[in-house]
Amino acid sequence: VFCTNADITEMYLNLEKSDEHDAPALVGVDATTKQQEAIRNGEEIGCVSQQPYAMGYQTIWAAVETTAPKKSVVIEKNVLSNPAWIDADCLDDPDYSGYLYTE
């Protein structure tokens, strides 16, 4: 099962499953705390995640730039945030800590 966002992934994780051995493989999006736990215990294979802090930073910076008095700026409409695959092998790797959501 591929879940297209964190909310859908968490809804799937909350579903009652009849037999854990027959549960379909799950791949999610965004490494929320609940998903990190699911990856650790094998409920979720892994997820594609972006860097939440960097995304927020870029958003605030764009807002500041557009409100600067008498300054002409060009704001990129789409900014690639270099997504990463997060699974049990890299979940605790410090290089991937920027991709993990904390709540």
Give residue ranges: language-model regions.
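Hydrophobic alpha-helical
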Residues: 1-37
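Sec-exported extracytoplasmic/periplasmic mature domains
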Residues: 13-17, 40, 44, 61-68
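Short, charged, surface-exposed secondary-structure boundary motifs
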Residues: 35-39, 56-59
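Short beta-strand elements at the ligand-binding edges of bilobed clamshell
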Residues: 41-53
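Hinge/cleft segment of the Venus flytrap/periplasmic-binding protein
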Residues: 51-103
